[in-house]
Amino acid sequence: MRHRLSLMACARWEADAIAEWLLYHRAIGFDHVYLYCNDDDPAALYAAVLPFLGGPAPFVTFHHFPFQGQQFHMYMDGLRRHRHETEWLMFLDIDEFLALRGGGDAHGLIDRLPPNQGCVTVNWLFFGHNFHAERPTGSVLGTYTRRAARLHATAKTLTRTACIDPDRIDRRIFFWHGWEGLLMPGAATRTVLGDDPEALPNDGVSITDDALASRMIGRAVLHHYAFRSAADLRRRWERGAGGDFHGQEMWKRVADADRVEAELAPMNEVEDRFLADVWAARMRAGAEATRLLPAPPGPNLALRRAATQSSIGPFSRGRTVAEDAAGAVNGAPTGGFQFHTAEEARPWWQVDLGAPSRVHEIRLFNGLDSPTMAARLRAFAVETSRDGTHWMIVHVAHPTDPPVGGIDGAPLCLRFPAPVPARFVRIVLRGGGVLHLDQVEVYGEAAP
């Protein structure tokens, strides 16, 4: 088979939310999505998913189904076309996100299942509108953090496709919520905890055993962002009530009766930031992974601190040693030199961090005006001192070492396994010549 674990979804008026939904479910392990567009015109949704359609192994298979609200027939078409391409298939809407609160990825729901288990059911956990009158733009996961206190009794199905025979499926059964005996003989259906879903205690709306519900939520649950604003109740009716969407007319009646906030109040009872925080952390980690340089481990203690150097020369930028040396701690790397000593034996530059500190990392940005100038920073030492008199060498560079870079993405980054106590940091050229750098950054924190 092409895929082990896939999603099938139908979407109407979801162009603004589809990208995050696809990115999220790909991130948690789904291999493919079969997406049925039910918009009158597929252009907007097609444009939104276009980045997922290309390449040798596209993440999305896109179909436009023009008959409004015919969810049953969309899914039946999908089963006939695609069920032999994937081992497992889950039916989701674009306002449903699978939350794996027990850890792992989506494959963990089907790993180690007995061969006779044909279906896993995952229950809804309704999230509210967070009291928005109109839909805000941006992330669904980051915006909606209020939810119902109780786990909903309704579930969606994750099914082994070998157990599905389309000819056995009854039109009256919404099989994406439960197969009701339509799977092949002997195929068992179980909850995420391995229980019989038909035996779950419920009042027709919610699971009534709170301890059981808590365990189910702690394993895996569907965050259902059905109403993203007060205006969404009327929006659900406006987008169409044809076919299997006929039940959406009830929300128009609620809106017309001015009962919107009362209807949505039970969905906003509890603050729950699980997916908001998980997704934000994933986005931060992804962004950090793109850095040419890792994020600094704390504040730059050298920034705009008092600095000095051994001399000034004809190419110095400042009129005094302090004025010239300050260029290397101005926080504005340029790729060129920002201080320049005279030619002399063992030229040096140093900075006073202003207070006793614990240094975790020192970064040296070389000037890159020319290869010849950059090569002058070869044989040198980095030293630290607590008092400005007694110095400890923390790094020695040799003439055979690779040249130090700078804003080209290759500065010298000295990371210390244990914090180095210091108030002063100095760079010393070990032979004769000139010393010039772009920036010196010192990361750490004040000593306790």
Residue ranges of each PLM-predicted region?
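N-proximal low-complexity "stem/linker" segments adjacent to membrane-targeting elements
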Residues: 1-23
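Short, acidic, metal-binding catalytic loop of nucleotide-sugar glycosyltransferases
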Residues: 23-32
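Short beta-strand/loop segment that forms part of the nucleotide-sugar
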Residues: 31-40, 63-65
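Active-site-proximal specificity loops/subdomain of glycosyltransferases
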Residues: 42-88, 100
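Acidic metal-phosphate-binding loop of nucleotide-sugar-dependent transferases
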Residues: 94-98
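Catalytic-site signature of metal-activated, phosphate-bearing donor transferases
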Residues: 100-294
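Aromatic, loop-rich ligand-recognition surfaces of beta-strand-rich domains
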Residues: 297-301, 311-317, 326-395, 410-448
